[in-house]
Design a protein with these regions (language model features):
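Short amphipathic helical patch at the helix-1/turn junction of helix-turn-helix
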Residues: 1, 12-13, 41, 52
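Short alpha-helical elements of helix-turn-helix
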Residues: 3-5, 29, 44-47
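Short basic helix-loop element that most often maps to the first helix and adjoining turn
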Residues: 5-24, 49
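Conserved hydrophobic/aromatic packing and binding residues within compact polymer-binding modules
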Residues: 7, 21-22, 32-35, 61
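Short, charged recognition helix plus adjacent turn
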Residues: 13, 34, 52, 62-72
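DNA major-groove recognition helix of helix-turn-helix/homeodomain DNA-binding modules
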Residues: 26, 45-60
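Recognition helix of helix-turn-helix/homeodomain-like DNA-binding domains
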Residues: 26-41
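Short, basic-rich loop-to-helix N-cap that marks the start of a DNA-contacting helix
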Residues: 39-49, 68
Length: 72
């Protein structure tokens, strides 16, 4: 799953519109829309706000796949 797809899935899973989510993370809905479309990548501060909002780590938020055995 790509990062934009993951953002869309997370938001829809909460039953939120882009216009409802954006104020919680301190950006405009138009800026958020560019992230879901894959047109732009969010700044670190926005990634942190999104991770906090969804209760995820940054790795979970950006769909980072750890190599097998890396957690050992």
């Amino acid at each position: 799953m790509t990062f934009p797809e993951h953002l869309l899935k997370l938001r829809k899973g909460r039953g939120l519109k882009q216009t409802e989510l954006a104020p919680f993370i301190g950006i405009s809905w138009r800026a958020y829309q560019t992230y879901e479309r894959g047109e732009r990548e969010p700044q670190m501060s926005t990634l942190i706000a999104l991770a906090d909002f969804y209760g995820l780590s940054l790795d979970e938020l950006v769909c980072r796949d750890w190599p097998k055995g890396a957690e050992e």
